[in-house]
Amino acid sequence: MEKTLAELVREYKGGNEKSFEKIAEKMNPMIMFYAGKLYTWEQEDARQEMLLTLFCSLKKMKYCKSEGECLSYIRTAVRRRYKDLVLKELHNQNKTVHTE
């Protein structure tokens, strides 16, 4: 039987580094969704940035009681990082427009 996201997160937090690969696999559709929306980025760079966000969110996560709680925490972290990157890109584009 396949482990749930909550079980994998608990294993990872308990020191099982291999669990990250399984978590990343489960979260891949969301990772690719946000990576694909970063139009000005190379696809692999965007994917790696979102995976790094996933990794950091797992390190910061204090506890994970349920599947929904884990998913919500990770989704929020990835979505916030995506928004930060978009805002940064817009800011950089505005700088370019004003200096030309």
Q: Which residues are covered by each model-predicted region?
A:
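Cytosolic regulatory regions built on CNB/CRP/Popeye-like sensor folds
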Residues: 1-2, 7-10, 60, 66
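Charged, low-complexity intrinsically disordered terminal regions and linker tails
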Residues: 2, 96-100
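A short, charge-rich alpha-helical start-of-domain segment used by transcription regulators
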Residues: 2-3, 10-33
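Conserved RNAP core-binding helix
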Residues: 25, 29, 40-60
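Conserved interaction-surface patches within small, structured recognition/assembly domains
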Residues: 34-38
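Short, aromatic/basic-enriched loop-to-helix "N-cap" motif that marks the start
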Residues: 43-44, 59-77
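Arg/Lys-rich amphipathic alpha helix in sigma70-family domain 2
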Residues: 79-96
